[in-house]
Amino acid sequence: MTTRLLLVRHGETEWHAENRYAGVTDISLTPRGAAQATDLGAWAGRSGVDAIACSPLSRARLTASPAAEALGLTVEVQEGLREVDFGWGEGRTIQEMADEDPEAVRRFREDADSGAFPGSEPVARAAARATASLRDLADRHPGGRVLVVAHNTLLRIALCELLGLPLGRYRRIFPRLDNGAVTEIEIRGTETALRSLNVPTAPPPAPAPGPSPAGD
């Protein structure tokens, strides 16, 4: 039986607004991030979600909370959905790291697996725990739709692993998952299909008013 997983990156934080690697550092949401969580909650309330799971980090939990309230569900916190530990890169921007060690950044950009930052969690290990969590959710909710709130790097790595794509190229294959946007996959047994990528949950902006009719 097919299970649909609705993968969502948490709302914006101060570090993400500055393009800093947050990793396992527990950074809370900005006002914009809280608004993204509210939009996700409204979207989930009309989208037929059967269960919700999230990373233990507060930015993911706060993003999942409005959806849980809208649906009357309890959020299942899964340790396997925690963001990758970036080691030396935690709290830094790429430019700051390049200023200190340009060769380390070059290796990372070339292959984020073999060129991972010093002290960081191996990409293969992160992929294994993330996919184990996602498959567990799929197994326990056959035929259901599960909202999963996690992190930009972890979800991209998991997508590569599930779709049989090279882990070290996750940054090139999936350049970015937007805050609060939904990426939908289907899991059926050992097979995974990508149904959509980076679909926004915020309502579209209201159209600008047109010119007044002649004579008004």
Label each PLM-derived region with a short phrase.
Residues G45-G48, L137-G144:
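Glycine-rich phosphate-binding loop signature in dinucleotide/nucleotide-binding domains
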Residues P56-L57, G80, V149-T153, L197:
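Short, well-ordered beta-to-alpha junction loops that form the rim of enzyme active sites
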